[in-house]
């Protein structure tokens, strides 16, 4: 039998309209504000202590987000705001405040000067024992005190408590006992929470809110949900006119400070104001909870049926039946099969299992997982439909990003994964956790496209966060791949069909210091067939767990709001029919989608993390034979760090804070480089056959230094060059570098950017400006001259690819090769060049780089593409571009490139035939 005193409420919440006069004991206190337990409540103290000890054993809460930051002013009153009254919640918050050295929650708050006397620092928005269950008595008293005393400062800290993080199941008979819900918790539910969910409990303190500011904004009618305050002014003015003279005088003083305040001396007089503030706080906490739990879940079978029988898919089924000559029933079964292929089957048990497994796995694989700028995501989560658009480096990306988001308290996103991952054992597990599967290619399959669009629309309208890799596949070179616009277009299509929340894209940079698939990537770039995913392949990867993989970095870039692009491109909202998926996007909207894709890639690059490994790779791969004297290596690393800090690529870019010596030691620890002892000074060189792998990490940050490298190369290769000439050449070739590396500098402001880069090089002593406006190299035997030569090297490989491509086009002539043939031939030539002259560096034969360059030539109108045949047509301007290469490349290298690109008709015909046969073997089997 439970003792009677254990059933007492934690505090007694009076609803009196006026404060009781302060007792002499309290007036005798020396401090105006004090936090003390009442001496006349020993049973409450005993109850709290005993309950706290029991709860501390049964419940192990996890703190989400950051702790609130409070001002040091002791005169500020601080209260924690919870939605529902609960003994367990109040004690849990008290334990958390004690553990994290926050102002205590279950300690009395007294302010004699302002007549505030509360026996706990917790405000319950819903209290079943209050006289008016719709109003919080404590909030009412605090509002009255703030209105009466202009100098009184009160901070409200909203707090979310989740007993379990399983999203609700629609139509579930056990939802009250299996997940956190939105109703007041009963005694039974509280006991169940403590006993079953105690180890899966989460607490998040939200940023403190100034009560006076909330009142001020409410009376002004600012912000979401403040329209309810429109009637407050007239009501409170009436109360003011009938109040006593001294109260009216106080009101006039308040109005002098804040004219929008209507002075009310009693708690009851502020009923509408308190009700509206309470509604505002409820809405805020509801949104925060939704951002952490996600939307209610529909049973997978029901969701598939809803998709198939939705008006949009019904129309698509009828169109498919008419086009294919099959029956509507057969077309419907086909659509249902497509839906079953892709629809996620979320299981919170699987998610929790993955969370525990991945927590162990990351400690085995990595020294740490470093996360940057996540606060941006948290600020948007409650009010926006989040679309995470990360770069794609590894299969680990799927799990890593979801893990970081879940660990920081937000709802886990649904991840669009290629159906190549839907393999036995692994496939169902991923489907139950984060993945919905889509085919790698479904061009021309109208019904599949319709089902996928409708599923995406369903997820977005249910406010489900989504994640997809805009590159379409994993980058094998470390550079960003050109964006694939399919999923992006579907997101825009859904927004224009009407959704509940505005869409915001979250560009996300993922950077590794070692990568599991590194060896496979190099082989695939060389032409080795791509290995299909399987359980055996997964087990092979598992064998690498004992290896050292360093740190992994996630950096969240500046969010991109879809509404901003719609305004820029004059795309009206709700411009597509809600019940159709086949309405095409018009030209303006398509142009907007393309622009969003490019901006996403640029923002991913802006958020890059310059890691120790990427810096080492950039330095050593630019040196002859990938080796440097250790002292010179340290100086070169320090130079690159200084350049990146003096003129940051972006405010979002993160630079390692390791010293150059620490960076070298770190690279040796990861077995990527090695130290060769020598009596004249130790040498640092790339270890074993790691050069090809290190090029991957160099390319992760190449965009940060590429313009500095380009300008250095122009000065270094010419000895002297006029500043105006340097700018002219750079402006001519910049569009190709921009296309390859997604540089964000605009063409019309490029001169200013170049001048800043040149000034940075001058300040570092790498180049010298002569009196006649000429830029010159430093003394040839100086340290700065050697550093300039190393810095000039990275851009050369890009320009060598450009020149080789242009040489091939010029030799074969206009109207003789298609775009695909040029890319294929350049890929083969790059492989040959890499083996003969470039230490087998994969940058020379990355097919995506040649595709990007040809695409840039077409976009800039240097090449014209025949719509029917795909044949490329060009004029002498191709030679003009190639002419600029001589300012950067040595004559010997230009001769080598021209020789490699010299192919006769027989060689070209043979190469094209072999490539065609290989592609037929690779793509001969297509899915229906």
PLM features per residue range, with description:
Residues 1-467, 472-928:
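Membrane-interfacial terminal anchoring regions of lipid-handling membrane enzymes
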């Amino acid at each position: 039998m439970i003792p009677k005193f254990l059933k007492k409420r934690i505090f007694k919440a009076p609803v009196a309209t006026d404060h009781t006069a302060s007792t002499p004991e309290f007036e005798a206190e020396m401090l105006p504000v004090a936090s003390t337990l009442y001496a006349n409540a020993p049973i409450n103290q005993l109850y709290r202590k005993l309950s706290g000890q029991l709860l501390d054993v049964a419940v192990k809460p996890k703190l989400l987000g950051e702790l609130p930051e409070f001002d040091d002013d002791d005169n500020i009153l601080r209260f924690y705001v919870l939605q529902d009254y609960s003994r367990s919640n109040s004690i849990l918050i008290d334990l958390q405040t004690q553990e994290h050295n926050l102002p205590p929650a279950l300690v009395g708050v007294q302010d004699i000067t302002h007549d505030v006397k509360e026996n706990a620092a917790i405000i319950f928005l819903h209290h079943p024992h209050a006289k008016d269950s719709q109003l919080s008595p404590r909030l009412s008293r605090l509002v009255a005190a703030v209105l009466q005393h202009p100098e009184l400062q009160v901070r409200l800290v909203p707090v979310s408590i989740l007993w379990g993080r399983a999203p609700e199941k629609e139509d579930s008979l056990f939802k009250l006992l299996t997940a956190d819900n939105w109703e007041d918790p009963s005694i039974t539910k509280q006991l169940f929470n403590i006993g079953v969910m105690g180890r899966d409990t989460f607490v998040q303190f939200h940023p403190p809110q100034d009560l006076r500011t909330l009142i001020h904004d409410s009376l002004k009618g600012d912000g979401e949900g403040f329209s309810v305050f429109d009637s407050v002014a007239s009501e409170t003015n009436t109360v003011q006119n009938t109040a006593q003279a001294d109260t009216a005088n106080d009101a006039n003083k308040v109005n002098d400070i804040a004219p929008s305040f209507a002075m009310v001396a009693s708690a009851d007089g502020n009923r509408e104001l308190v009700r509206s503030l309470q509604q505002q706080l409820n809405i805020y906490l509801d949104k925060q909870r939704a951002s952490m739990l996600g939307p209610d879940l529909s049973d997978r079978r029901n969701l598939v049926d809803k998709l198939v029988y939705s008006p949009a898919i019904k129309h698509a089924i009828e169109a498919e039946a008419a086009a294919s000559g099959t029956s509507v029933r057969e077309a419907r079964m086909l659509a249902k099969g497509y839906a079953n292929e892709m629809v996620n089957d979320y299981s919170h048990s699987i998610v929790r299992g993955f969370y525990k497994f991945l927590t162990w796995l990351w400690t085995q694989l990595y020294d740490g997982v470093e996360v940057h700028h996540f606060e941006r995501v948290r600020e948007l989560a409650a009010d926006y439909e989040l679309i995470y658009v990360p770069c794609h480096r590894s299969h680990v990306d799927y799990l890593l990003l979801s893990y970081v988001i879940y660990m920081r308290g937000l709802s886990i996103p649904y991840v669009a994964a290629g159906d190549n991952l839907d393999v036995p054992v692994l496939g169902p597990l991923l489907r139950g956790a984060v993945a919905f599967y889509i085919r790698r290619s479904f061009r021309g399959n109208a019904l599949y496209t319709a089902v996928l669009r409708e599923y995406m629309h369903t997820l977005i309208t249910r406010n489900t966060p989504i994640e997809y890799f805009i590159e379409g596949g994993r980058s094998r070179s470390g550079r960003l791949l050109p964006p694939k616009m399919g999923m992006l277009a579907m997101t825009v299509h859904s927004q224009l069909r009407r959704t509940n929340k505005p869409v915001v894209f979250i560009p996300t940079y993922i950077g590794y210091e070692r990568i599991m698939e590194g060896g496979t990537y190099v082989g695939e770039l060389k032409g080795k067939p791509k290995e299909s995913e399987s359980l055996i392949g997964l087990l092979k990867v598992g064998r690498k767990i004992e290896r050292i993989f360093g740190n992994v970095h996630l950096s969240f870039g500046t969010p991109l709001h879809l509404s901003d692009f719609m305004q820029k491109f004059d795309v009206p909202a709700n411009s597509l029919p809600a019940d159709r998926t086949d309405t095409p996007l018009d030209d303006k909207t398509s142009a907007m989608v393309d622009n969003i894709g490019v901006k996403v890639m640029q923002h991913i690059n802006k958020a890059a993390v310059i890691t120790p490994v990427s810096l080492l790779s950039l330095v050593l791969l630019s040196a002859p034979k990938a080796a440097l004297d250790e002292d010179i290596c340290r100086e070169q690393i320090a130079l690159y760090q200084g350049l990146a800090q003096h003129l940051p690529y972006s405010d979002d870019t993160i630079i390692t804070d390791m010293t150059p010596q620490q960076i070298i030691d770190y690279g040796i620890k990861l077995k990527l480089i090695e130290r060769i002892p020598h009596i004249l000074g130790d040498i640092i060189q790339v270890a074993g056959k790691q050069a090809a792998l290190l090029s991957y990490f160099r390319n992760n940050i190449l965009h940060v230094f590429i313009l500095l490298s380009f300008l250095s190369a122009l000065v270094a290769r010419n000895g002297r060059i006029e500043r105006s000439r340097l700018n002219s050449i750079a402006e001519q070739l910049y569009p190709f570098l921009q296309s390859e590396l997604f540089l964000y500098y605009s063409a019309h402001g490029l001169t200013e950017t170049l001048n800043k880069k040149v000034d940075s090089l001058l300040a570092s002593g790498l180049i010298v400006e002569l009196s006649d406006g000429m830029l010159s190299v430093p003394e040839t035997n100086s340290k700065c001259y050697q550093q300039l030569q190393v810095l000039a090297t990275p851009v050369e490989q890009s320009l060598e690819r450009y020149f080789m491509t242009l040489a091939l086009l010029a030799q074969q002539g206009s109207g003789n090769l298609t775009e695909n043939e040029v890319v294929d031939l350049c890929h083969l030539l790059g492989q040959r060049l890499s083996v003969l002259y470039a230490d087998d560096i994969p940058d020379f034969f990355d097919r995506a780089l040649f595709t990007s360059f040809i695409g840039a030539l077409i976009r800039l109108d240097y090449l014209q593409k025949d719509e029917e045949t795909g044949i490329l047509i060009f004029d002498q301007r191709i030679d003009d571009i190639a002419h600029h290469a001589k300012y950067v490349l040595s004559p010997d290298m230009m001769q080598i490139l021209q020789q490699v690109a010299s192919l006769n008709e027989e060689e070209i015909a043979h190469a094209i035939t072999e490539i065609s046969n290989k592609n037929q073997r690779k793509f001969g089997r297509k899915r229906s």
